[in-house]
């Protein structure tokens, strides 16, 4: 089930990116968290630096946005959304994508 959830999560992130509802990169996500319409969900790769994970979780907690550190590496996350480099975090702006991606992230983490 975990491999299926991982594949589904990566696919949903790619679809979300193509629909224009995904913010890519930690700096952009942090900036958007303070915006008028912040992302509804933030996904952070498990191999992101400790500083990045800490920064994202604290900022999300402060702004009351769900944050999920998932067992994906930055390369997988970047590849799934069509980026050539490593991406440590993404923000989901659409409520329907956020709901499904959040469910898949919880399954992947084993906390469904």
What do the predicted segments below correspond to?
Residues 78-112:
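C-terminal structural segments of small proteins and small subunits
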């Amino acid at each position: 089930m975990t491999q299926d959830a991982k594949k589904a999560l990566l696919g949903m992130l790619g679809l979300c990116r193509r629909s224009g509802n995904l913010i890519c990169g930690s700096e952009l996500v942090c900036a958007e968290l303070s915006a008028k319409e912040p992302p509804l969900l933030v996904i952070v790769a498990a191999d992101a630096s400790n500083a990045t994970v800490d920064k994202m979780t604290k900022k999300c907690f402060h702004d009351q946005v769900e944050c999920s550190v998932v067992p994906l590496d930055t390369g997988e996350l970047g590849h799934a959304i069509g980026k050539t480099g490593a991406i440590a975090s993404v923000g989901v702006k659409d409520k329907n994508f956020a709901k499904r991606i959040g469910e898949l992230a919880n399954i992947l983490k084993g906390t469904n």
